Amino acid sequence: IYGGLILNATINLYAYCTIEETNDNKIVINSYDVCCHKIYPLAKCLDIDGEASLVKGVYNRIMRDYGLDAKSFKITTYNDAPAGSGLGTSSTMVVCVLKAFVEWFSLPLGDYELSRLAYEIERKDLGLSGGRQDQYAAAFGGFNYMEFLQNDLVIVNPLKIKRWIIDELEASMILYFTGASRSSAAIIDEQKKNTSQGNSAAIEAMHRIKQSARDMK
């Protein structure tokens, strides 16, 4: 309703994905960070059953949108950051896996298209609640001022920040993993509920966040 503004910075924790084409008429998924190993018969659509859902969601969407012939392959993924750490691990992995398929099939997707498709896969195809900035942050990287406008329009403005400012910022921050994880979906659902019901305190808080992004820029 009101649009959004975000000043986003990425860090040097990464998601990794490799795809190896095989000839055994199987699809093998290895996700080492979540201890998942699955083998499926070759198919153009894989059932979303709670196992390796992010990889399956990307694969199903690529097959459907681009009408590609199914090929047997082995895909291996790993994430530096723990799942549920609040660092956008799921969205980053979707972008990473999607980029791997884009490279494999030589698909014409730039950073904007990649981000938008990753968002649609995660939020619409898989039904995972969340925001929109994580996919764009993972695809673009660096420091970005993002504008979320009407009609799903997103504008990413890369920021040129002096090295000494980045060094000072890094020296002033500590990232610590408590060992506990949480689902961001429940938090996002609560925020959406509050704003859709016209909760004035929640809406005012969102406006203050937007203003903070303007001020930081």
Predicted feature descriptions by range:
Residues I1, I6-G67, R116-S129, Q135-K217:
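C-terminal nucleotide
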Residues L13, L87-L107:
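DPxDG-like acidic metal-binding loop motif
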Residues R64-K74, F101-L117, N151:
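Phosphate-handling active-site elements
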Residues K74-Y78, C96, P108, I121, ...:
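Generic hydrophobic-segment detector
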Residues Y59, A70-N79:
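Flexible, acidic active-site loops/lids enriched in D/E/S/T/G that coordinate Mg2+ and/or position polar
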Residues A81-S85:
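Short pre-catalytic strand/loop immediately N-terminal to key active-site residues, enriched for Gly-Thr
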